[in-house]
């Protein structure tokens, strides 16, 4: 993949996301990426519906999206940045660290979550990101995460 291709992608639909990430239903937490700024930042979208399997047990009478899945959506959006930048088939992005995680407000079916992810630093194959999950412009969760790019044959 050329350097130009890695910096000119401004959005990604589900087909492009599935080329970048190995996740599939029911664990693909990003439906669309509406903005990608090179390897600096991205905004991923998750449309939350009551039909998702985790709502059968979390909680049937008052469904709330598990916080860990918000973190996963942040990590997958960050992973798409890494995968797009590296542009090498056969690479995997591993979620390594989570720091400063805060959950501010419940996310419920019908919400549209935006995962705002910004690269904080990169050294070699290690990437650090600050992430905010927002619903209707309000921060519902935030975290600092770390990721590592690994060749599939080394995994």
Curated annotation (Swiss-Prot):
Its EC number is 4.2.1.59. Its main location: cytoplasm. It is found in: Cytoplasm. Keywords: Cytoplasm, Lipid A biosynthesis, Lipid biosynthesis, Lipid metabolism, Lyase. InterPro entries: FabA_FabZ, FabZ, HotDog_dom_sf. Signal peptide: none annotated. One of its GO terms (molecular function) is (3R)-hydroxyacyl-[acyl-carrier-protein] dehydratase activity. One of its GO terms (biological process) is fatty acid biosynthetic process. It catalyses: a (3R)-hydroxyacyl-[ACP] = a (2E)-enoyl-[ACP] + H2O. The active site is at residue 58. It comes from the Bacteria. Transmembrane segments: none annotated. Involved in unsaturated fatty acids biosynthesis. Catalyzes the dehydration of short chain beta-hydroxyacyl-ACPs and long chain saturated and unsaturated beta-hydroxyacyl-ACPs. Belongs to the thioester dehydratase family. FabZ subfamily. This is 3-hydroxyacyl-[acyl-carrier-protein] dehydratase FabZ.
């Amino acid at each position: 993949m050329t350097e130009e291709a890695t910096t000119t992608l401004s959005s990604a639909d589900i087909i492009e996301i599935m080329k970048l990430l190995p996740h599939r239903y029911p664990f693909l937490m990003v439906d669309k990426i509406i903005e990608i700024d090179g390897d600096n930042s991205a905004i991923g979208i998750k449309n939350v519906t009551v039909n998702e399997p985790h709502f059968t047990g979390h909680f049937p009478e008052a469904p709330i999206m598990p916080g860990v899945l918000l973190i996963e959506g942040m990590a997958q959006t960050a992973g798409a940045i890494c995968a797009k930048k590296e542009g090498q088939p056969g690479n995997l992005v591993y979620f390594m660290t989570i720091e400063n995680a805060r959950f501010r407000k419940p996310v419920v079916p019908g919400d549209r979550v935006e995962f705002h992810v910004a690269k904080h630093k990169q050294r070699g194959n290690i990437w650090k990101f600050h992430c905010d999950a927002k619903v209707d412009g309000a921060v519902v969760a935030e975290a600092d995460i770390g990721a590592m790019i690994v060749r599939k044959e080394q995994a």
